[in-house]
């Protein structure tokens, strides 16, 4: 905790550089700003499982959420979006459990508590929207649908949910939880937005709940963003099938076919889940294309639906490394009401003079614009 306190103390001495065009010698610490003062943002946090599975890595996840909280006003952050796999194992009782004793040193309860502690940085400041990953259910990875998530993420813990959480779906036991939930936002330029976060591999009942919701009189004119754990592979293809024992379920292509493609107002899909360790050249420069994917397809009525995958859990080059170098994405919703500017940033690298020059990922796969259709 001393190290985390030191990190957070460093963050208070911020100076600003543009999120859209960092140039010249970086200031220390590096703080992004919106390219337009009328914009707002949402922060996309990729799978945190490799932060929380090791005791030594857990402060890095809390660094991410503390940074988001500290920049809430600077970046006009409306929500933090978590792509799932909040933990590595949902129900592991023994830290050194077989079959993989090297895959973390924390029990599941310790992992979920670390998640809760990190999210507490955002309580009362903004809603955090969490979709459920395959590691968040079952024993280790989606053997069945039991999840500890409802014990740690529930409406009463964060007062910011009161103004945004508008609907929940029954889980596999018929109990309403935040495993599948919808959140509403309003903006003068963007109008009405609805963000729907799904359980992992959503069941038919969950897809039908979402369909009825987005077609209802209350939300049929909202632009809908789907936050789901598994959707795109690293090559940008939609995943057609996965090897988990879970049943009943819908894999990503079925989710597209049954819900997204026929819809008139789903305008964006965000996901994590996939991604492989980047390759490093002789100078230590990483090729991060394996941690990101983007594609655009037309819905049945002809409007474009961008789909974006971002997962940096192995962004340091190792599945069992530091958890991902604290990479996150800043989604800047521009005041034209249709453009989202995406940039990729590490609060960890930003706070040290030795690494500040690495705080941004500026390749085409990590800095781009998305155009979002109106219903």
Write out the residue ranges for each language-model feature.
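Solvent-exposed loop/turn segments at secondary-structure junctions
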Residues: 48-51, 86-90, 134-139, 199-204, ...
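Active-site neighborhood of phospho(di)ester-bond hydrolases with catalytic His/Asp-centered motifs
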Residues: 44-46, 78-85, 124-133, 198, ...
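Conserved beta-sheet core of the metallophosphoesterase superfamily
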Residues: 247-335
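Extended active-site neighborhood of metal-dependent phosphoesterases/phosphodiesterases
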Residues: 92-208, 219, 262, 283-311, ...
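Active-site-proximal segments of metal-dependent phosphoesterases and phosphodiesterases across multiple
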Residues: 98-100, 104, 108, 205-208, ...
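Hydrophobic h-region of N-terminal signal peptides that target proteins for export
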Residues: 10-18
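A short C-terminal boundary segment appended to hydrolase-like catalytic domains
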Residues: 36, 320-375
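N-terminal active-site segment of His-dependent metallophosphoesterases
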Residues: 20-106
């Amino acid at each position: 905790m001393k190290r985390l306190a030191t990190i957070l103390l460093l963050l208070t001495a911020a100076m600003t550089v543009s999120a859209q065009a960092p140039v010249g010698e970086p200031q220390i610490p590096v703080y992004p700003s919106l390219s337009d003062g009328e914009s707002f943002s949402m922060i996309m946090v990729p799978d945190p499982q490799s932060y929380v599975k090791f005791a030594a890595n857990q402060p890095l996840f809390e660094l991410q959420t503390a940074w988001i909280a500290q920049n809430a006003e600077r970046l006009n952050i409306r929500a933090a979006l978590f792509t799932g796999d909040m933990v590595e194992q949902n129900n592991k009782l023994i830290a050194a459990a077989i079959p993989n004793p090297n895959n973390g040193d924390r029990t599941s309860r310790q992992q979920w508590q670390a998640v809760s502690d990190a999210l507490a940085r955002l309580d009362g400041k903004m809603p955090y929207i969490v979709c459920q990953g395959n590691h968040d259910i079952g024993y280790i990875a989606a053997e069945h649908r039991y999840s500890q998530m409802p014990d740690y993420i529930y409406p009463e813990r964060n007062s910011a949910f009161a103004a945004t959480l508008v609907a929940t779906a029954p889980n596999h036991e018929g109990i309403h939880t935040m495993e599948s939930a919808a959140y509403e936002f309003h903006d003068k330029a963007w109008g009405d937005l609805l963000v729907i976060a799904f359980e992992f591999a959503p069941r038919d009942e969950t897809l039908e709940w979402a369909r009825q919701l987005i077609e209802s009189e209350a939300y049929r004119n909202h632009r809908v963003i789907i936050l789901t754990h598994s959707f795109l592979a690293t090559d940008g293809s939609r995943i057609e099938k996965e090897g988990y024992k879970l049943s009943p379920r819908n894999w990503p292509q079925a989710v597209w076919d049954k819900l997204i493609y026929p819809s008139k107002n789903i305008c964006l899909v965000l996901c994590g889940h996939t991604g492989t360790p980047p390759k490093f050249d002789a100078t230590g420069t990483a090729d991060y294309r394996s941690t990101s994917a983007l594609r655009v397809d037309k819905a049945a009525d002809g409007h474009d639906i961008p789909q974006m995958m971002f997962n940096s859990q192995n962004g340091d080059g190792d599945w069992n490394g530091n958890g991902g170098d604290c990479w996150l994405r800043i989604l800047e919703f521009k005041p034209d009401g249709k453009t989202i500017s995406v940039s990729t940033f590490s609060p960890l690298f930003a706070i040290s003079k030795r690494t500040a020059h690495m705080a941004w990922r500026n390749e085409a796969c990590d800095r781009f614009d998305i155009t979002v259709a109106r219903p």
